[in-house]
């Protein structure tokens, strides 16, 4: 028996979606509604054989979901709203409360809204998306899938910041980590491809894209991750600085009379690859500029790789070794240069890349005699979300759900 599951990612002015047939994991359609709240909202829906695009007014998220469901019916992707058996919602922050994906109830939704203080740009709109789908599809169970939940297995030394204790105890300031859905999916696929239980592996997963994070996974548990209290921290990213000396901020604020909001804009939107290269936040553009001799672009690429290498080194120490290094995300999956730079001169760890395999994006790119496996695995957060819907909302199907 097959089930139609929707995976939803609601943004402040957008709604990204995918409809999957489960447990096969086949994508039936995917799309995006952008510029919600505007008279010229952009609607894109794609199947394997067709693509529809139009510009229409979309007043709010309720209008967006209503429009999406109307289009699925109109394009005969579904015959009835009852064809949708469940809906999975990506939620940015689960705090310490949610340690796994969960079936949405009124109480669950209220808790997601209360956690908005930890993710003010994301949780409110994630909750709004859940609320609208529950209204319009009352017979389809909704499941909340949290970016932070996979990292709730971190031990205290990995998540506590060396600040006065009350900042954690009273305000919840700690490392939470993000990209958990991606790290969980990719590590599961790796274990399946190796034919080894994830519980027997020490894995470092590099999710590299405009937002990047590194995750150490030991015996199937996240034991450390580079993003912290917010997705701004950790390694260098497209427009985000990652970790810097915190005293730089008050120094800049005093010298340039910047407000906290302006400092946040600087760290989140003007730094990283864009800030150092002066070219672009897109790794491909920076790579192209570096190839033409642009010194700052070359430096940006070097910094990007070195911050990742330093993080990998510390995680190998923490886990007492490494069995597999995995690359995923837009850069991790597509840039041979980035992978090569991260793995450069690591033969002393038993880690070496075969450049011919690397250039053709093979699944395993380590040399024949390397002790550490190096893998390139496409992430699929939507499939992971759909699998969690099956596991939690349709438990009779649990045995059918395996990573694709």
From Swiss-Prot:
Chief localisation class: cytoplasm
Swiss-Prot/TrEMBL keywords: ATP-binding, Cytoplasm, Kinase, Nucleotide-binding, Transferase
Subcellular location: Cytoplasm
Catalyzed reaction equations: propanoate + ATP = propanoyl phosphate + ADP
Mutant phenotype after disruption: Decreased propionate kinase activity, cells grow to lower density on 1,2-PD and excrete more propionate into the medium. A double pduW-pduX deletion grows as well as wild-type on 1,2-PD.
One Pfam family cited in the UniProt record for this chain: Acetate_kinase
InterPro entries in UniProt: Ac/propionate_kinase, Aliphatic_acid_kin_short-chain, Aliphatic_acid_kinase_CS, ATPase_NBD, Propionate_kinase_PduW
Triggers of expression: The BMC operon and BMC production is induced by growth on 1,2-PD vitamin B12 medium.
Domain of life of the organism encoding this protein: Bacteria
The EC number(s) this enzyme carries: 2.7.2.15
GO MF term set: acetate kinase activity; ATP binding; propionate kinase activity
Cross-referenced SUPFAM superfamilies: Actin-like ATPase domain (SSF53067)
UniProt enzyme class: transferase
CDD domains assigned: ASKHA_NBD_AcK_PK
Pathway the protein takes part in: Polyol metabolism; 1,2-propanediol degradation; Organic acid metabolism; propanoate degradation
A GO cellular-component term linked to this record: cytoplasm
One GO process term, biological-process aspect: acetate metabolic process
Similarity-based family: Belongs to the acetokinase family. PduW subfamily.
Biological function: Works with phosphate acetyltransferase (pta) to capture exogenous propionate and regenerate propionyl-CoA during degradation of propionate and 1,2-propanediol (1,2-PD). Ectopic expression partially complements a cobB deletion allowing some growth on propionate. Restores growth to an eutQ deletion on ethanolamine and tetrathionate under anoxic conditions.
Name of the protein in its database record: Propionate kinase PduW
Organism listed in the record: Salmonella typhimurium (strain LT2 / SGSC1412 / ATCC 700720)
Lineage, opening ranks: Bacteria, Pseudomonadati, Pseudomonadota, Gammaproteobacteria, Enterobacterales
């Amino acid at each position: 028996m097959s089930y139609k599951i929707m995976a939803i990612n609601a943004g402040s002015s957008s709604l990204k979606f995918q409809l999957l047939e489960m447990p096969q994991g086949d994508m039936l359609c995917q799309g995006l509604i952008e510029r919600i709240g505007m008279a010229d909202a952009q609607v894109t829906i794609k199947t394997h054989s067709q693509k529809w695009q139009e510009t229409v007014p979309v007043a709010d998220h309720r209008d967006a979901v209503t429009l999406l469901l109307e289009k699925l019916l109109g394009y005969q992707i579904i015959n009835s709203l009852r064809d949708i058996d469940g809906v999975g919602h990506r939620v940015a922050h689960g705090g310490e409360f949610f340690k796994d994906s969960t079936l949405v109830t009124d109480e669950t939704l209220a808790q997601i809204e209360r956690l908005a203080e930890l993710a003010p740009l994301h949780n409110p709109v994630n909750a709004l998306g859940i609320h609208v789908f529950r209204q319009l599809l009352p017979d389809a169970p909704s499941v909340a899938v949290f970016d932070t939940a996979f990292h709730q297995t971190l031990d205290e030394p990995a998540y506590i910041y060396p600040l006065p204790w009350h900042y954690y105890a009273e305000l919840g300031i700690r490392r939470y980590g993000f990209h958990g859905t991606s790290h969980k999916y990719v590590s599961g696929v790796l274990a399946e491809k190796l034919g080894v239980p994830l519980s027997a592996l020490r894995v470092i997963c590099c999710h590299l894209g405009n937002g990047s994070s590194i995750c150490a996974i030991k015996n199937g548990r996240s034991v450390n991750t580079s993003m912290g209290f917010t997705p701004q921290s950790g390694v260098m990213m497209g427009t985000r600085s990652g970790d810097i000396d915190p005293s730089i901020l008050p120094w800049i604020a005093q010298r340039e009379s910047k407000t906290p909001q302006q400092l946040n804009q600087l760290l989140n939107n003007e730094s990283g690859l864009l800030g150092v290269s002066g070219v672009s936040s897109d790794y491909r553009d920076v790579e192209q500029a570096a190839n033409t001799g642009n010194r700052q672009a070359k430096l940006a690429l070097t910094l990007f790789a070195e911050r990742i290498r330093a993080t990998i080194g510390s995680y190998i120490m923490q886990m007492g070794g490494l069995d597999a290094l995995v690359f995923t995300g837009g850069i991790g999956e597509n840039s041979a240069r980035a992978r090569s730079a991260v793995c450069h001169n690591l033969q002393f760890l038993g880690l070496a890349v075969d450049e011919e395999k690397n250039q053709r994006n093979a699944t395993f790119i380590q040399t024949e005699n390397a002790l550490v496996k190096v893998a390139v695995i496409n992430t699929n957060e939507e499939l992971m979300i759909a699998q969690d819907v099956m596991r939690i909302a349709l438990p009779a199907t649990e045995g059918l759900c395996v990573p694709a």
